[in-house]
UniProtKB/Swiss-Prot annotation:
Further facts: The light-harvesting antenna system in red algae and cyanobacteria is formed of phycobilisomes. These are composed of the phycobiliproteins phycoerythrin (CPE), phycocyanin (CPC) and allophycocyanin (APC). Cyanobacteria also contain phycoerythrocyanin (PCC). The phycobiliproteins all share the same subunit composition and organization with variations in the covalently bound open-chain tetrapyrrole chromophores.
Location of this chain's protein in the cell: Plastid, Chloroplast thylakoid membrane
Membrane topology classification: Peripheral membrane protein
Organismal lineage: Eukaryota, Rhodophyta, Florideophyceae, Rhodymeniophycidae, Ceramiales
Post-translational modification: Contains one covalently linked phycocyanobilin chromophore and one covalently linked phycoerythrobilin chromophore.
Main localization (coarse): plastid
Protein name as it appears in the record: R-phycocyanin beta chain
Length: 172
């Protein structure tokens, strides 16, 4: 995983050049939105348990067969594994958000996840629905500006939405 700064430096170094004005401007934009990015990650981190729990409840209300005998989330052990996996995805989405880059999400969470779920018989479509529900909850939190400094966070909202969409597509 390389953050935006490391990527820019690595690219310039590979070419044996100084950073261009365009690259410097891009890095300045990242710095200027840094506090907003931290606010987004803090909201998700501070509400992670509720995001995961409420998404799971909504999923199981829509798909009760998952928690019925023989379902993929039936028994407390399987339910715990489901909640753990949802929390891991949410955590890596927050890592991608703070880094401003999806590679940490891809490399450490999503690569091979679909194949793992297929091997375990876990319905990827249901996991994708759970991720969508976490996305909806996270976006509602991020869009709630109560108690946070005013500022346009539309680009960050769109960015975090893409990380959730990427995760859902990876398992579907």
């Amino acid at each position: 995983m390389l953050d935006a700064f490391a990527k820019v430096v690595a690219q310039a170094d590979a070419r044996g050049e100084f950073l261009s004005n365009t690259q410097i401007d891009a890095l300045l934009a990242i710095v200027s939105e840094g506090n907003k990015r931290l606010d987004v990650v803090n909201k998700i981190t501070n509400n992670a348990s509720a995001i995961v729990t409420n998404a799971a409840r909504a999923l199981f209300a829509e798909q009760p067969q998952l928690i019925s005998p023989g379902g993929n989330a039936y028994t407390s052990r399987r339910m715990a594994a489901c909640l753990r996996d949802m929390e891991i995805v949410l955590r890596y989405v927050s890592y991608a958000m703070i880094a401003g880059d999806a590679s940490v999400l891809d490399d450490r969470c999503l690569n091979g996840l679909r194949e793992t779920y297929q091997a375990l018989g876990t319905p990827g479509a249901s996991v994708a629905v759970a991720i969508q529900k976490m996305k909806d909850a996270a976006l509602a939190l991020v869009n709630d500006t109560t108690g946070t400094p005013a500022g346009d966070c539309a680009s960050l909202v769109a960015e975090i939405a893409t990380y959730f969409d990427r995760a859902a597509a990876a398992v579907a």
